[in-house]
């Protein structure tokens, strides 16, 4: 995922957490906020309490990033995906499905924004 398509700084995440629309599922929580970049920007959060080891945490983050890459999000949105406990043992297919369903719910709630 290109650098321009990622949320990188703390204030970018803070804005999405404070003002974004929350879409919760059993595996992930999406926070979606319109942006002015002209393309989607993604952020991923996997907590240390959820996955204590760095290897497992980064593995889950990579899997979420790939699921997001394969999901269609064509509009200008900041999207933060936060892993939930069920995501640890979920298959990649389940993670991809959860991301896709979350984005389609976001599109409906934003009036066709994703």
Where are the predicted features?
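Positively charged, solvent-exposed patches that mediate nucleic-acid binding
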Residues: 1-114
């Amino acid at each position: 995922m290109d650098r321009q398509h990622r949320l990188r700084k703390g204030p970018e995440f803070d804005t999405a957490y404070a003002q974004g629309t929350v879409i919760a599922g059993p595996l992930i929580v999406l926070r979606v906020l319109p942006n002015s970049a002209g393309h989607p920007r993604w952020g991923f959060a996997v907590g240390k309490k959820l996955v204590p080891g760095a290897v497992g945490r980064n593995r889950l983050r990579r899997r979420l990033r790939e699921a997001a890459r394969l999901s269609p999000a064509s509009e200008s949105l900041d999207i933060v995906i936060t892993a939930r406990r069920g995501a640890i043992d979920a298959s990649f297919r389940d993670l991809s499905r959860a991301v896709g369903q979350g984005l389609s719910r976001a599109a409906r709630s934003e009036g066709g924004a994703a």
